[in-house]
Regions:
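Catalytic His-Asp segment of secreted/periplasmic serine-dependent ester chemistry enzymes
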Residues: 185-260
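A mature extracytoplasmic/lumenal domain signature
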Residues: 93-96, 104, 143, 181-184, ...
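N-terminal secretory targeting modules
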Residues: 1-86, 102, 258
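Active-site segments of SGNH/GDSL-like serine hydrolases
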Residues: 140, 144, 169-199, 224
Length: 260
């Protein structure tokens, strides 16, 4: 009888020990889980705080890249046209640039072109630029600049061009600068003015200027096939309506590459 009671007592002791061990395991598991969860929560909270501390300007490049990618996909799917990709910009230039406005391709308020315009007429548009506060500034001058032989001035064409661009940056210091190369005229038009044959010289200066200042040089000259492409009006200088989508796509491609 005593043995049976002893055996029963030992069984109870073993059961209590097992229960105790299980309780300890459960407590340890709970503590580990709680600690691990707290670390994840703390990490999440730290990330949120870090994001909140970031200024809007710091987040803007990331958001802009995402927006550009979404727009590129939409354009590839035929939901947008190339002109929709021009955003928060101004486009300065001569009568060639005015075609973007005249044909209804771009916002007239943002196309700051002039008939007979030269790089020296940037001053005429500084008030508009200050009002619009664009983040992208596109420039396309050259034909009239060559006609006026601006390269003969002190410091050459690049010096004059750079001075004018810096006037813009004094107003919108964070704007990205995009400089279109000069597109040559046709060989027939060149016969009317030998000055227009300086495209290569002027473009070399523009390219070097952009490299020096970390601006983006856009090679548009290649679109002309040395003046033999079917892109010109009868005067051999101005462009057909059909050329503007091609020109616009070249500009947007360069913009996306520069900002990617």
């Amino acid at each position: 009888m005593i043995n049976k009671r002893g055996q029963h007592k030992r069984k109870n002791q073993r059961s209590l020990i097992l229960i105790g061990i299980l309780c300890i395991v459960m407590i340890c598991t709970f503590v580990f889980f709680l600690h691990h969860t707290n670390k994840e929560v703390q990490a999440g909270q730290a990330y949120v705080v870090a994001q909140e501390k970031k200024s809007t300007s710091a987040l803007k490049p990331t958001l802009e890249k995402k927006r550009q990618a979404e727009m590129s996909q939409a354009m590839a799917e035929g939901k947008l046209n190339v002109y929709s990709m021009f955003d928060d910009y101004v486009f300065l230039g001569d009568s060639r640039v005015m075609g973007f406005e005249e044909y209804g391709y771009l916002d007239a308020n943002r196309v700051l072109g002039d008939s007979g315009g030269t790089i020296k007429r940037v001053d005429d548009h500084l008030n508009d630029i200050q009002s619009l506060k664009p983040t992208r500034v596109y420039l396309s001058y050259g034909m009239n600049d060559m006609g006026l032989k601006i390269n003969d001035e002190e410091g050459g064409y690049a010096k004059v061009y750079e001075t004018e661009v810096k006037k813009i940056l004094a107003i919108v210091p964070n704007a990205k600068i995009y400089v279109c190369s000069i597109i040559p005229c046709t060989p027939e038009a060149l016969q009317k003015s030998s000055s227009w044959g300086q495209v290569g010289t002027y473009n070399q200066q523009l390219k070097a200027m952009c490299k020096k200042n970390k601006w983006t040089y856009i090679n548009c000259t290649k679109l002309a096939d040395n003046g033999n492409a079917d892109i010109y009006q009868s005067d051999g200088i101005h462009f057909l309506t059909s050329f503007y989508p091609v020109w616009a796509q070249t500009i947007i491609d360069a913009t996306q590459k520069a900002e990617s």
